[in-house]
Amino acid sequence: MIAADTSILIYAHREEVPEHVSALAWLTRLAEDPLLWGLPVFCLGEFVRVVTHPRIFDPPTRLESALEALFGLLASPSLRVLNPGPRYPELFSQHLREADARGNLAFDAQIAAVCVEHRVTALLTADRDFARFAKLKWLSLSDAPT
């Protein structure tokens, strides 16, 4: 199962970013494919936080538009929201230690841990910091969707 992180959701949503077309193509492919794909639960709130933030986007996305985009993705029948399970605390601490994660990287460790717990085969991301987590394979937007 491929999972997508917040950066992909943001780029697919915001038309003015250079990565918009490729992120939208990836998300469309994932959402329409019958194969399971995942979104770490942490990315849902982070997406809303970023796209509605007036210091990040001018103008920011209206809350209702952000929620509409989010619920549009959640309607994909092949999507699984990846929630922490019983192994999550140990996996999270392992990922924190492995990457010596502090600050913002600690948030990425959460995503990596929940993906590993759900046996995600690759995380689609524009964030190269995920390379610090050896147990998690990642894909970039330049890796064409198949």
Descriptions of predicted regions:
Residues 1-39, 54-68, 146:
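Short, well-structured N-terminal submotif of metal-dependent ribonuclease cores
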Residues 33-34, 76-77, 133:
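Structured helix-beta-strand junction loops
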